[in-house]
From Swiss-Prot:
Null allele phenotype: Deletion of the gene abolishes induction of the melREDCA operon the presence of melibiose and raffinose. It does not affect growth in the presence of glucose and arabinose, but it has a negative effect on the ability of the mutant to grow on the alpha-1,5-arabinose oligomers alpha-1,5-arabinobiose, alpha-1,5-arabinotriose and alpha-1,5-arabinotetraose. Deletion mutant cannot utilize pectin and galactan, and shows a slower but steady growth rate in the presence of type I rhamnogalacturonan or polygalacturonan.
Protein name according to UniProt: Oligosaccharides import ATP-binding protein MsmX
Signal peptide: none
Keyword Phosphoprotein: no
Family: Belongs to the ABC transporter superfamily.
UniProt gene name: msmX
Organism encoding this protein: Bacillus subtilis (strain 168)
Membrane topology designation: Peripheral membrane protein
Gene Ontology molecular function terms on file: ABC-type transporter activity; ATP binding; ATP hydrolysis activity
Amino acid sequence: MAELRMEHIYKFYDQKEPAVDDFNLHIADKEFIVFVGPSGCGKSTTLRMVAGLEEISKGDFYIEGKRVNDVAPKDRDIAMVFQNYALYPHMTVYDNIAFGLKLRKMPKPEIKKRVEEAAKILGLEEYLHRKPKALSGGQRQRVALGRAIVRDAKVFLMDEPLSNLDAKLRVQMRAEIIKLHQRLQTTTIYVTHDQTEALTMATRIVVMKDGKIQQIGTPKDVYEFPENVFVGGFIGSPAMNFFKGKLTDGLIKIGSAALTVPEGKMKVLREKGYIGKEVIFGIRPEDIHDELIVVESYKNSSIKAKINVAELLGSEIMIYSQIDNQDFIARIDARLDIQSGDELTVAFDMNKGHFFDSETEVRIR
């Protein structure tokens, strides 16, 4: 178990712009932290600096209060799980899991005990004498996890470990990794580009873009209160809807539509000097409703929408529509038989909406 601190971490390669730019994060003991962001945002580079596989260009990294910038990877007491499993094809599952322990010249009885315990936790007991080619993708990933578990390290690092698996296996392995963390309580950093993995697995999420942290928070906080337009658009599937509009006192005008803004939000916008200015309004697809009782309650924030596309997804329908050429998606219940081309009255739950500065794209609060 370990507490980690990263203070003003930078990573420079040949380019002038840093690959990781002023990264600051405190990770408490037993946390499951997820770094999430698009390709090239610096999340894997940051993970590799934690592991000691990349040199920290500037800044300080601490494990349990000890600065470890110059400590070799093998001496950091960290176990890493990679995207490609990194298994030895000529070795059995048992030997793959035990390999790191044998290198450390651990006594055979202790190796046997640790491997068997890890195999039991991961459901690999009957596969210990098989070779990797005889295993499914999910089983191979379990072997890679087993190799990390037997190390009994202070910190687990996982670099997109599920990206090679199909969708069904990813869901299954997500649950297994969560259960594993609940059981072992090892401080974990997990890297992914998949926002669903971030939302379902993390104690806290670190959203990154262009080498910079955009937001740090619990999955609930990041989803419900995005720091900026990027976070709102990246976290959530479908993403948050965004509209450019102009604020008047009490209303936001989006083209020909005028939506009433709740007084609590209006007070903040008024105090910040946004009346008469263009802002960006954001709202989640599930906060746009078609139920009659909601439409009646929110008459002042309702519009008639022509349905361009209706996607049936079992118990819900994704409605694709527009307000004056600005696209939006609504997630509604599948109780109605809705078709493309139909017209539907929908209400925006303005209490759930957010306003962003049109220039900085930062949430106004």
